[in-house]
Amino acid sequence: MSILNHFIFTFFLFCLGLFGIILNRQNIIIILMSIELLLLSINLNFIYFAVLIDDIIGQVFSLLILTVAAAESAIGLAIMIVFFKLYGDISIYKINLLSL
């Protein structure tokens, strides 16, 4: 596979995650999964270009992003569990009412 095929694949993943955020404003779990898909596509780009230029910095940076993404998803899921225990629903509209 050429680098263009890899770039098209990661661009497709990025667009899929972006459309998941834009089109689904009701379910916070799908929004969180779409954010993770965005981060995965960015990580794949870092790895592809690090292999292309034969440099390890892109792979190290990709591991750093994976660590931050894992922490972000763990914190997001913990907040959703607490919110569900308190209110019985994880609707975006109820979460937006908390900021008022």
From Swiss-Prot:
Keyword line: Electron transport, Membrane, Mitochondrion, NAD, Respiratory chain, Translocase, Transmembrane, Transmembrane helix, Transport, Ubiquinone
One example GO MF annotation: NADH dehydrogenase (ubiquinone) activity
GO aspect biological process, one term: ATP synthesis coupled electron transport
Main location: mitochondrion
UniProt keyword annotation of Flavoprotein present: no
Record-listed E.C. numbers: 7.1.1.2
CC terms in the record's Gene Ontology section: mitochondrial membrane; NADH dehydrogenase complex
Subcellular location: Mitochondrion membrane
Presence of keyword Methyltransferase: no
InterPro entries reported for this sequence: NADH_UbQ_OxRdtase_chain4L/K (IPR001133), NUOK/Mnh_C1-like (IPR039428)
Residues spanning the membrane: 3-23, 28-48, 64-84
PANTHER family reported in the protein's UniProt record: NADH-UBIQUINONE OXIDOREDUCTASE CHAIN 4L, NADH-UBIQUINONE OXIDOREDUCTASE SUBUNIT ND4L
Function field: Core subunit of the mitochondrial membrane respiratory chain NADH dehydrogenase (Complex I) that is believed to belong to the minimal assembly required for catalysis. Complex I functions in the transfer of electrons from NADH to the respiratory chain. The immediate electron acceptor for the enzyme is believed to be ubiquinone.
UniProt name for this protein: NADH-ubiquinone oxidoreductase chain 4L
Source species taxonomy: Eukaryota, Sar, Stramenopiles, Oomycota, Peronosporales
